[in-house]
C-alpha cells in the first residue's frame, strides 16, 4: 500500500549528523511513511551505521554520486510515497510529533511548507513560510527543504537540475509555482531543525551566482524580472514574519 510520505536522507561522510537524523526519523509517532537513505559512498563509517539500522529503512544505497541533487534525484526515483521530504544528514525533525502534525495537512497541493528552526553557532531563529506565496518572496528568499513536502509525482516528472550545486530546490519551486502554476500551502507547525553549516548557507557567493543564472534562464535576464508592487496584505505579512523572526532571535529560541 502506498505510503503518505517518503522521508529521504542524503549523506556523505557525515556520520555524526547521520546518526542525529536517523534517530529523529525513527522516533516519529507517525507511521505512514517510508524511509530512504542515499549515501554517496562514505568512508567514515556511515555505510556500516546504515547497515546496522537496515531493518528500519525501506530502501538505501551507498555508492558514488555526482553531487547532492544527483543523490536527491536518485532517491526520488526510489520513492513511492505521495509526498517527499528531504531530511538530509545533520538536520532533524523538531519533535517526535512533527511528521504526524504535518501529515494531517497534506491534502492535494503540490507544495506544503512548514516552519523551521534555524540554528547557527550562537542562537536559534524561527523561519516562517508565507501564508500566501508571492513572487517577491521567492525572488528574495528561500524555502527550507527540510520543512517542505513536495508531491512525489511532480518530482518524478520534473527532477532537480543537477547542473546547479546549491539552489536547484529553490529553482524547482520557482519554475513550477510561477510558470506552471503549481499549488502551494503553508503549514502552521514547526517541522524541522536546520543547522547553518550546510553547503547552501556557507557559500553565499555561489548562491547568488546560481540564482542569477536561474533568473536569466527563466526570464531572459535579471532586468526582465517581474516588477510586482507589494500589496498591503503582503506588507503586513512581511512585517509580522520579520517581527517573529527577530523576536525569536532576541529570545535565542
Please annotate each region the language model reported.
Residues 3-6, 34, 171:
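Cell-envelope/extracellular polymer assembly enzymes that use nucleotide-activated donors
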Residues 126-214:
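Conserved nucleotide-sugar donor-binding catalytic segment
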Residues 1-27:
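N-proximal low-complexity "stem/linker" segments adjacent to membrane-targeting elements
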Residues 84:
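Short aromatic/hydrophobic "clamp" motif used to bind/position activated sugar donors
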Residues 92, 96-126:
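Conserved donor NDP-sugar-binding/catalytic core segment of glycosyltransferases
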Amino acid at each position: 500500500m502506498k505510503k503518505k510520505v517518503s522521508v529521504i536522507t542524503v549523506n556523505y561522510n557525515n556520520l555524526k549528523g547521520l546518526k542525529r537524523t536517523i534517530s529523529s526519523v525513527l522516533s516519529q509517532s507517525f507511521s505512514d511513511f517510508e524511509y530512504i537513505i542515499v549515501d554517496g559512498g562514505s568512508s567514515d563509517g556511515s555505510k556500516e551505521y546504515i547497515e546496522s539500522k537496515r531493518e528500519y529503512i525501506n530502501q538505501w544505497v551507498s555508492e558514488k554520486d555526482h553531487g547532492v541533487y544527483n543523490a536527491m534525484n536518485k532517491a526520488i526515483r526510489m520513492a513511492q510515497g505521495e509526498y517527499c521530504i528531504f531530511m538530509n544528514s545533520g538536520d532533524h525533525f523538531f519533535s517526535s510529533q512533527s511528521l504526524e502534525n504535518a501529515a494531517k495537512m497534506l491534502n492535494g497541493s503540490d507544495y506544503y511548507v512548514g516552519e523551521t528552526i534555524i540554528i547557527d553557532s550562537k542562537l536559534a531563529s524561527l523561519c516562517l513560510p508565507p501564508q500566501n506565496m508571492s513572487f517577491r518572496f521567492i525572488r528574495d528568499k528561500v524555502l527550507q527543504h527540510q520543512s517542505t513536502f513536495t508531491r512525489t509525482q511532480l518530482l518524478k516528472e520534473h527532477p532537480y537540475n543537477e547542473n546547479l550545486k546549491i539552489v536547484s530546490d529553490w529553482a524547482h519551486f520557482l519554475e513550477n509555482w510561477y510558470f506552471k502554476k503549481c499549488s502551494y500551502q503553508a503549514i502552521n507547525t514547526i517541522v524541522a531543525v536546520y543547522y547553518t553549516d550546510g553547503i547552501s548557507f556557507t557559500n553565499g557567493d555561489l548562491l547568488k551566482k546560481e540564482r542569477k543564472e536561474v533568473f536569466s534562464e527563466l526570464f531572459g535576464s535579471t532586468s526582465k524580472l517581474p516588477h510586482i508592487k507589494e500589496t498591503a496584505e503582503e506588507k503586513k505579512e512581511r512585517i509580522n514574519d520579520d517581527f517573529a523572526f527577530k523576536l525569536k532571535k532576541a529570545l535565542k529560541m
